[in-house]
């Protein structure tokens, strides 16, 4: 079973370019964002005057990906996926939600 986790972890770190591209697109649209990429955690935070800004993240837990959304005011959502593509799709939907 540990081999599955390692494979998934490698997939997450190998997708850094996709998150970097999203960050660049957001910056081109005028948003101030910060990207954090680690082995088992990737997040994009919207830098605003709110002391607790919007954050969207993908975290690695054993053999699944947890996509989290924090709106900066008290609404938190998270979804778990075994497939990175589905998790990334949810991640981008949360980014779209954050832009409005």
Segments predicted by a language model, with ranges:
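Charged, low-complexity, helix-prone segments enriched in Lys/Glu/Asp/Gln
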Residues: 11-15, 65, 94
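Short intrinsically disordered terminal tails
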Residues: 1, 96-100
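Residue-level detector of alpha-helical secondary structure
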Residues: 23, 27, 85-88, 92, ...
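Negatively charged, low-complexity tracts enriched in Asp/Glu with abundant Ser/Thr
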Residues: 1-50, 73
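Intrinsically disordered, low-complexity regulatory segments enriched in Ser/Thr/Pro
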Residues: 52-90
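Alpha-helix boundary/interfacial micro-motifs
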Residues: 46-47, 79-80, 88, 99-100
